[in-house]
Amino acid sequence: MSNRVIIFDTTLRDGEQALAASLSVKEKLQIAMALERLGVDVMEVGFPVSSPGDFESVQTIARTIKNSRVCALSRALEKDIDAAAQALSVAEQFRIHTFISTSTIHVESKLKRSFEQVLEMAVGAVKYARRFTDDVEFSCEDAGRTPIDNLCRMVEAAIHAGARTINIPDTVGYTVPSEFGGIIQTLFNRVPNIDQAIISVHCHDDLGMSVANSITAVQHGARQIECTMNGIGERAGNCSLEEIAMILATRKNLLGVETGINAKEIHRTSNLVSQLCNMPIQSNKAIVGANAFTHSSGIHQDGMLKAQNTYEIMTPESIGLNRNNLNMTSRSGRHVIKHRMEEMGYSEQNYNLDALYEQFLHLADKKGQVFDYDLEALAFMEAQAAEDNFYQLQQLVVQSDSTEGVATATVRIDVGGEIKTEAATGNGPVDAAYNAIARATDRRIDIISYKLSAKGEGQNALGQVDITAVYHEQNFHGVGLATDVVEASARALVHVMNLTCRADKVADYKQNMHKNRELGGV
């Protein structure tokens, strides 16, 4: 049996299902490219039949990614498989992942079929998917609660039909390690053709067992783990990619397996996913939390000064986190910024040095010292602003009356090349700024969540504002970054305005396309 564990990332499929607002195609592509740098073997990037947007994002990623295998999900239905195959056809190499429920409660209550009918559907789906690719994965949904006799029959039949990867999901996070390991061991003992496929696991974290169950499965012969960055996913989330990667690396002598993950990309990829998905990382999160390498106990600090491995089983450098947060000032030249970005793992293709340096100088003038985490935040915002925007905030002036609690905001905005200046009052400076922006853009949206977080340390830290807004019954996520909270809030709103503007253009395009089809058919 191979000692190589395949890392199957499903951040852009299962992970995205947990988000309040869908990611744009550009944002999904950013994450996909980061996952490729991270070294994931397979990335599941969407469910093409579910929506035109998902189809487009899968196709865009499939066309771009070269070093990881791109995968799309489909139910055990021919129309789903057709959509997946069509979206993936532009890829150099791809996988179709088809699934059906196998537990008694799912078969009877959800599918309302007999197990024999479900078995027949599974076999038919695998055979149909094999028409498009040799790389077909089949999942037994809710395998953790499936009677073991039925599970063995399903796995044997799917392999015989042509599946080269068999996925055993603990869909509702119900099992414990000894139980889940026993399921994997039983499959190896009882399925006669199991050597013709790779056994995969996909564990959810409802009882906090996803990582432990996945590691136990590897000890019993599984050689693919399905996971997400930061463990994001439905309900309590999925198995965390960064935890799996570092467990297998740190305990290699015990577990005897390895992955192809470039661990030095973990920190950067984790931050990108957190920012784009608007899902902050808890400070005590294993591997990537802010406190993961922090030692506050005096005894621990003394030990660390004498020998780092007294209290560190891995180093921050091993995940790409540099201990030396070198401070930079407005006197630092472009070469310093370029060097620091290279030290953090960013190539010049990942950012615009001139634009980043201009933003750096602006920030350095405001706060004096600029640190690595500031640069990363600026690079992230510079990448977000790289698209052509219909609305561009040029100036924001706010005045507050502390006695009456009323604020006045004046904004100057470039609206499609026309400069508009508007003023408005509100219940506080942020409300006033939002009202002024709404006037200038003549675009009304409903904000359903507002979140403020600090990016950096001290009183001059950058403030990041994340908002979720509803426009035409669709959720949009905007982000703004500035040393001033009101400015960050305004930038987040303008970001959302631009997203809704693009959504309108897409809707108009689709409407015209349908009209042209109707005219052509007359």
From Swiss-Prot:
Residues 392-522 are annotated as: Regulatory domain. Transmembrane segments: none annotated. It catalyses: 3-methyl-2-oxobutanoate + acetyl-CoA + H2O = (2S)-2-isopropylmalate + CoA + H(+). Its cofactor is Mn(2+). It is an enzyme of class 2 (transferase). One of its GO terms (molecular function) is manganese ion binding. It is found in: Cytoplasm. The keyword Metal-binding applies. Its EC number is 2.3.3.13. Pathway: Amino-acid biosynthesis; L-leucine biosynthesis; L-leucine from 3-methyl-2-oxobutanoate: step 1/4. Its main location: cytoplasm. Coiled coil: none annotated. Homodimer. Belongs to the alpha-IPM synthase/homocitrate synthase family. LeuA type 1 subfamily. This is 2-isopropylmalate synthase. The lineage of its organism: Bacteria, Pseudomonadati, Pseudomonadota, Gammaproteobacteria, Alteromonadales. The gene is leuA.
